UniProtKB/Swiss-Prot annotation:
Record-stated family: Belongs to the prefoldin subunit alpha family.
Gene source species: Pyrobaculum aerophilum (strain ATCC 51768 / DSM 7523 / JCM 9630 / CIP 104966 / NBRC 100827 / IM2)
UniProt keyword Kinase present: no
Lineage, broadest ranks: Archaea, Thermoproteota, Thermoprotei, Thermoproteales, Thermoproteaceae
Principal subcellular localization: cytoplasm
GO MF annotations, alphabetized: unfolded protein binding
Origin superkingdom: Archaea
Cross-referenced CDD domains: Prefoldin_alpha_GimC
Protein's name in the database: Prefoldin subunit alpha
Length: 132
């Protein structure tokens, strides 16, 4: 293996490391969004349920106790806009977003796995050459 080949492997290894860091940060963000969406979906489903007193998560581990007669929720539409949605539409939209972000999370996991495998291959090749 020529010196240029070794240099290319080292550069590729460094680039893969940077890409992995970026993808892992994106994965963490998507996982947090999924958790938030799931919590919101649970809250909407609670509001759709029979009347009576209940605890509803309002974020940051906080819950509010009370009797809720809400038939609509204020939901973000994007670009700073919000709209009131009936509970069925809110539930549908949340489910769609959860599905979308779940697919993205799976895709990120697959890409992370592929890059990690390539990094391991390069690391092994470099170790065989006595480079660490």
């Amino acid at each position: 293996m020529s010196r240029q080949d070794v240099q290319r492997l080292l550069e590729e290894y460094q680039l893969i490391g940077e890409l992995l860091s970026s993808l892992q940060a994106q994965h963490a963000t998507v996982a947090e969004l999924l958790e938030e969406l799931t919590t919101a979906l649970d809250g909407v489903r609670l509001l759709k349920g029979e009347g009576g007193e209940r605890l509803v998560h309002i974020g940051a581990g906080l819950f509010v106790k009370g009797v809720f007669e809400a038939k609509e929720v204020l939901a973000p539409l994007g670009a700073g806009y919000h709209a009131f949605l009936d509970l069925n539409n809110a539930e549908r939209i949340l489910q769609e977003r959860i599905e979308e972000y779940s697919k993205l999370k799976t895709s990120l996991e697959e890409n992370i796995e592929k890059l990690a495998e390539r990094a391991a291959q390069i690391r092994q090749a470099l170790e065989r050459l006595g480079i660490r």
